[in-house]
Regions:
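Long protein-protein interaction modules used by eukaryotic assembly/scaffold proteins
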Residues: 2-17, 21-22, 66-105
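N-terminal ordered "arm"
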Residues: 2-58
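An N-terminal, globular interaction/scaffold subdomain
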Residues: 36-86
Length: 105
């Protein structure tokens, strides 16, 4: 059986955030964490921010239960922008209902 996944973030084809099939219990803390991290990175990197943002690798993650919602979450995150160029990562994530944390390859 295929595992359900959802998406949150920016896509060049859209004018605003994409939020698809992810619970607010994940999206709300994940969004806050990303915004705080991006603000800190912009401050620390100054003029180098944009180059660093767009050359960042795709990140794979496993989140323990309670970090961003009750369920453990597995996913990937990459740099992206919306239609007018506003920067914000795109995240694809899936809750692990059985409590497992699969190895990402």
């Amino acid at each position: 059986m295929a595992q359900k996944f959802g998406a949150f973030g920016k896509l060049p084809a859209l004018g605003d955030f994409l939020k698809m099939d992810l619970p607010a219990s994940f999206v709300d803390p994940w969004d806050r964490w990303l915004q705080e991290g991006m603000l800190a990175a912009r401050s620390a990197l100054g003029d180098r921010w944009q180059d660093c943002y767009f050359s960042a690798p795709i990140w794979r993650f496993n989140l323990s239960p309670g970090l961003a919602g009750a369920a453990p979450m597995t996913g990937v995150m990459m740099s992206s922008v919306d239609r007018v160029g506003r920067q914000f990562p795109l995240t694809l994530a899936s809750p692990q209902a059985d409590g497992s944390a699969p190895v990402l390859q």
